[in-house]
């Protein structure tokens, strides 16, 4: 079983071990839910207009938002009550392991790419932007940055 997280533990999964302080009330699941809600709000506001000019696809946007941090369940662990990098997480960050999970479960390449490219850690150049990735990436970055500014790891 990859990651070793159970249903109870998933709710305690960290937002980002070593980057955001352990006392940050925003968990990884909270963050993913927030990114999904923000993507839905942005789509509701911009969807019709953005769809006319860029063919923004709602299902791709939301699927990418739901799964963008799926690899964190392989990257992180809880030891002695504190968030830390797992053995696998020492070698692969969450975008790599998340893309692996998505690809090995038959998800479309566009979703795999959204997982792989959503973080500036992996690809700051934005070599291939399409509207769903651009929107999700910017909203993810905004949500993460607010938590990080409020609870920086010292």
Located regions from the model:
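Histidine/acidic-rich helix-loop-helix segments that form or flank divalent-metal centers
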Residues: 50-52, 56, 61-62, 99-103, ...
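A broadly conserved amphipathic alpha-helix scaffold signal in soluble, globular proteins
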Residues: 37-40, 44, 96, 100-103, ...
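Acidic/His-rich, divalent-metal-binding segments that scaffold phosphate/diphosphate chemistry
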Residues: 1-85
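Histidine-centered active-site/metal-ligand motif
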Residues: 31, 68, 94, 99, ...
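Alpha-helix boundary/interfacial micro-motifs
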Residues: 80-81, 85-86, 123, 151
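Divalent-cation-assisted or electrostatically stabilized phosphate/pyrophosphate-binding catalytic cores
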Residues: 82-104, 129
């Amino acid at each position: 079983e990859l990651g070793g997280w159970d249903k109870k533990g998933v709710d305690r999964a960290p937002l980002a071990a070593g980057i955001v302080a352990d006392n940050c009330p925003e968990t990884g699941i909270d963050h993913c839910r927030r990114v999904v809600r923000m993507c839905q709000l942005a789509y509701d506001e911009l969807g019709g207009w953005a769809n006319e000019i860029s063919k923004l696809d709602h299902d791709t946007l939301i699927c990418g938002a739901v799964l963008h941090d799926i690899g964190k369940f392989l990257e992180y662990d809880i030891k002695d009550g504190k968030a830390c990098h797992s053995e696998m997480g020492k070698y692969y960050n969450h975008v790599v392991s998340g893309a692996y999970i998505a690809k090995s479960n038959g998800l479309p390449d566009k979703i795999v790419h959204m997982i792989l490219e959503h973080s500036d850690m992996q690809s700051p150049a934005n070599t291939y932007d399409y509207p769903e990735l651009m929107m999700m990436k910017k909203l993810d970055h905004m949500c993460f940055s607010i938590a990080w500014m409020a609870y920086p790891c010292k």
